[in-house]
Curated annotation (Swiss-Prot):
InterPro entries: Nucleotide-bd_a/b_plait_sf, Ribosomal_uL23-like, Ribosomal_uL23/eL15/eS24_sf. Belongs to the universal ribosomal protein uL23 family. Disulfide bonds: none annotated. It comes from Rhizobium rhizogenes (strain K84 / ATCC BAA-868). This is Large ribosomal subunit protein uL23. GO terms for molecular function: rRNA binding; structural constituent of ribosome. Gene3D superfamilies: 3.30.70.330. One of its GO terms (biological process) is translation. GO terms for cellular component: ribonucleoprotein complex; ribosome. Keywords: Ribonucleoprotein, Ribosomal protein, RNA-binding, rRNA-binding. The keyword rRNA-binding applies.
Length: 97
């Protein structure tokens, strides 16, 4: 049985035009918790999906400042992880966990 904290590390798959292009290179993009480290992300992906991870790259997208009817607000910051899988392995992110 998978450890429940793995579900706290991986928030959701990031399904965008760029992330679908990365699937040609055996890479998958996930939104992850801001406090998640690369070893935690690697362990979570390997445990939840049963694949071998070769590399994890992370980035922090800062939220934009938005205005609506004169009020200033801010979007949330999002941490993304680009996970490189071993050759011949893949993850279908369109299905749920």
């Amino acid at each position: 049985m998978t450890d429940l904290r793995h579900y706290d590390v991986i928030v959701s798959p990031a399904i965008t035009e760029k992330s679908t292009l990365l699937s040609d290179n055996n890479q998958v993009v996930f939104n992850v918790a801001k406090t998640a480290t690369k070893p935690e992300i690697k362990a979570a992906v390997e445990a939840l999906f049963g694949v071998k991870v070769t590399a994890v790259n992370t980035l922090l997208r800062l939220g934009k400042t938005k205005r609506f009817k004169g009020l200033v607000g801010k979007q949330k910051d999002v941490k993304k992880a680009i996970v490189t899988l071993a050759e011949g392995q893949s993850i279908d992110v369109s299905t749920g966990l």
